[in-house]
UniProtKB/Swiss-Prot annotation:
SMART domains: Haemolytic (SM01234). This is Putative membrane protein insertion efficiency factor. It is a peripheral membrane protein. It is found in: Cell inner membrane. Belongs to the UPF0161 family. Residues 72-97 are annotated as: Disordered. One of its GO terms (cellular component) is plasma membrane. Its main location: membrane. Pfam families: YidD (PF01809). Could be involved in insertion of integral membrane proteins into the membrane.
Length: 97
């Protein structure tokens, strides 16, 4: 099943995609994301990840970088490093003087 999916993705990338042009608002493109997802996570989970990505690829989504989880080492942010913290705490004081 995995090789069948990868073959379909390859066919799309080599035949259909050049003909219709690059319309994807993400990096990597949705077809490349699907290929990496199937390679990394197998047919079932890879297809689910690809379907989720395709649902986000529309004009109302800003797009940007969206890597397959676990496919690109170092591409996923360190959760502790990106914790939201308040810049200051003086906003809780009363400034109505």
């Amino acid at each position: 099943m995995k090789s069948l999916l990868l073959g379909a993705i390859w066919l799309y990338q080599k035949v259909l995609s050049p003909w219709i042009g690059n319309q994807c608002r993400f990096y990597p493109t949705c077809s490349e994301y699907a290929r990496q997802a199937v390679e990394t996570h197998g047919s079932l989970r890879g297809s689910a990840l690809a379907a989720k990505r395709l649902c986000k690829c529309h004009p109302w989504h800003p797009g940007g970088f969206d890597y397959v989880p676990g496919a690109v080492p170092g591409a996923e942010p360190d959760q502790e490093q990106h914790q939201c913290t308040p810049l200051c705490n003086h906003h809780s004081e009363d400034h109505s003087q």
